[in-house]
Amino acid sequence: MTRQRAHIHPFLHAASNLEKHLETLFAESNIRHRQALVLDALRAIGASSQQYLAKHFGVSAGTMSSMISRLEALGYVQRERDVSDRRIEIISNTAAGIAALESVEKYWLDGDAMVENILGTEDAEKFFTLADELSKGLGGGRPKPEKRGT
């Protein structure tokens, strides 16, 4: 009886290797690529609660709190209390955070170029489209602005 190999293994291995490559590129900066993703999300959707960000990124509130604390210590985000519910902290990018994000976007473009160099332009486009569909199907994708009470 032959064992059927799962098709997902090469994808998981490739994703892990790509993430390691990005981590190496981001080591030149003072933020990690996942922190840059948070800055990018805040740029796209505007100020959001820490809880909303944790849910979107699929991490615990504690993990998101640690990430936000580090970004805040670097001067890249600021926290403010929600005027409608003082228990909620609203996180937003600072000008320094936007500048930091813009300085590391080249690393994501390097990742895109690496995939394109391996797969070719046409297959890379298909891959990125399929990866986006997969991400959305798994509950990911670009975040939407948070709906909060006023």
Predicted regions and their residues:
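Short alpha-helical "packing" element that flanks the helix-turn-helix/winged-helix DNA-binding module
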Residues: 38-39
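Charged, amphipathic alpha-helical coiled-coil/dimerization segments
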Residues: 69-132, 136
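Key DNA-contact positions within bacterial/archaeal DNA-binding proteins
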Residues: 62
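N-terminal leader segment of winged-helix/HTH proteins
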Residues: 1-29, 145
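The alpha-helix within a helix-turn-helix
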Residues: 54
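Short capping segments at the starts of secondary-structure elements
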Residues: 45-49
